Amino acid sequence: MTRIQDDLFATVNAEWLENAEIPADKPRISAFDELVLKNEKNLAKDLADLSQNLPTDNPELLEAIKFYNKAGDWQTREKADFSAVKNELAKVETLNTFEDFKNNLTQLVFHSQAPLPFSFSVEPDMKDAIHYSLGFSGPGLILPDTTYYNDEHPRKKELLDFWAKNTSEILKTFDVENAEEIAKSALKFDALLVPSANTSEEWAKYAELYHPISTDSFVSKVKNLDLKSLIKDLVKTEPDKVIVYEDRFYESFDSLINEENWSLIKAWMLTKIARGATSFFNEDLRILGGAYGRFLSNVQEARSQEKHQLDLTESYFSQVIGLFYGKKYFGEAAKADVKRMVTAMIKVYQARLSKNEWLSQETAEKAIEKLDAITPFIGFPDKLPEIYSRLKTTSGSLYEDALKFDEILTARTFEKFSEDVDKTSWHMPAHMVNAYYSPDSNTIVFPAAILQAPFYSLEQSSSQNYGGIGTVIAHEISHAFDNNGAQFDKEGNLNKWWLDEDYEAFEEKQKEMIALFDGVETEAGPANGKLIVSENIADQGGITAALTAAKDEKDVDLKAFFSQWAKIWRMKASKEFQQMLLSMDVHAPAKLRANIPPTNLEEFYETFDVKETDKMYRAPENRLKIW
């Protein structure tokens, strides 16, 4: 039998870990996933009810329900022909030469399902957060990340073989000739991309990916395509700069995107179109289309038709469904209570920053200014993004609706370039069990769905709530001061606001945090301290600040606080899924998240009488304190 002094995670969650079962259609079960399952059940019933009693007074929700009904009309889906998919494939098949491809770039972006072998995006400018910038990156890889392509990776061959076989079967369904050769050619192009692709560690340090290049310099370096004309077609003007997020890809552009590789690029585009179409037709094709993803994570069976129907609707109407969910399930009492906790947590942070022992007063004061400028959003947004008023279902097929929606969404992406950034917009729907900090707007967002037990409940004690949602709130605040967020000022701009000596001291703290987790063994392999450092800084800051706030309450119970902390990180997952997370997820494995941060807190040792001989013991000189 385990003891808290040896393993907080395993002891607190012992009964749950023994009894919890991973759903057959998921790679894991966790405190988060349990709420997701509850929400799915509620929303499926809600949308089915709305299907019978159409919300004619809510035009956006009405369109979502129409699409939901179409997604669930399996009689029509089973009979639907593939002419629209074949039409999309033909848009690429008829590009016989690289010259044809060059002459059709704009058409492919705005009026086809074919992805280009490079990507332009419109994001808030990291150095001018009120305006948008044009970003440039590579096209993404077939395997989860670059580490999977190492020859010593145990799953490399089986995953690539499975993808090729699965993709050729999909292509054959759409009557594509030479399906096996096309799948093999796509893999050849994918392999060419690997050396120039960012690693997961590089993506994790997103503040370091901001590489602005004047548009003239950017387009002149690329000889094989007329990117100047494409950019003008995309954003209807000539920006003064392009932000390159994947340097190696940009440097390698002409050696990858050229006449010699055209047949490989063409094959790669065809596979993307075909795979992307599998969700919109008959049941056999839907099952076939999801097979690779299930094999990757060792998921036992496909999502049910009902869940798929909800998933597909959410993929286009997420904020619409979120707003409906928030208004139905999130009460004013809970909103007021969570707002009170956010205010309390910010006050705790103010006090901790003012007493910080390793920052100069000047930097601490600027940190407090940034803290005071953080805007919290709780529950659900006040309004929907305007784009939803444009999404209208038609009399055509489910796939044809999706094509139209994708065109509208793509056009909207580039249309935003000439507008100011709306810092009140939400990037997560209210029914998503999650929370986030946005560095470019300096906002923290807590959707309604996470504001449920075990994270939060009006029925739980204050210590339980601080051990749950309190740590999540403080975690998101801490992201303003993690290795990425700390580089953004109170306005959301990438801007050096620290004194040099303070930032150097912070970098030393980061190294200590990396060392604390790096190489720690889990059942799926060792943790990568560099990949997960930002989230670990936020976890440590979160539990530290929430603990301080919990102690200020009259009914403080630190055993309940630490137990609740361990409960929110409970998780069981397939080994394959855990291995994938180790390679690419910026969060630490669940058990390490639960067990390591408390060992840096004196109160943990006092509460559970942890001794030097216990496994959870960390010597005082090795206990890390950042915020």
From Swiss-Prot:
A GO biological-process term: protein processing
Activity dependence on pH, as recorded: Optimum pH is 6.0-6.5.
Subunit composition and interactions: Monomer.
EC number of the protein: 3.4.24.-
Biological function: Endopeptidase with broad substrate specificity for several oligopeptides.
Signal sequence residues: none
Enzymatic class: hydrolase
Disulfide bonds: none
SUPFAM superfamilies associated with the record: Metalloproteases ('zincins'), catalytic domain (SSF55486)
Organism this protein belongs to: Lactococcus lactis subsp. lactis (strain IL1403) (Streptococcus lactis)
Keywords: Hydrolase, Metal-binding, Metalloprotease, Protease, Zinc
Residues annotated as binding Zn(2+): H475, H479, E535
MF-aspect GO terms: metal ion binding; metalloendopeptidase activity
Keyword Cytoplasm (UniProt): no
UniProt-listed InterPro entries: MetalloPept_cat_dom_sf, Peptidase_M13, Peptidase_M13_C, Peptidase_M13_dom_2, Peptidase_M13_N
An annotated GO cellular component: plasma membrane
Note describing how the cofactor binds: Binds 1 zinc ion per subunit.
Comment on activity versus temperature: Optimum temperature is 30-38 degrees Celsius.
Protein family: Belongs to the peptidase M13 family.
Keyword Transcription: no
Domain Peptidase M13: 1-627
Name under which the protein is recorded: Neutral endopeptidase
Active site: E476, D539 (proton donor)
Cofactor: Zn(2+)
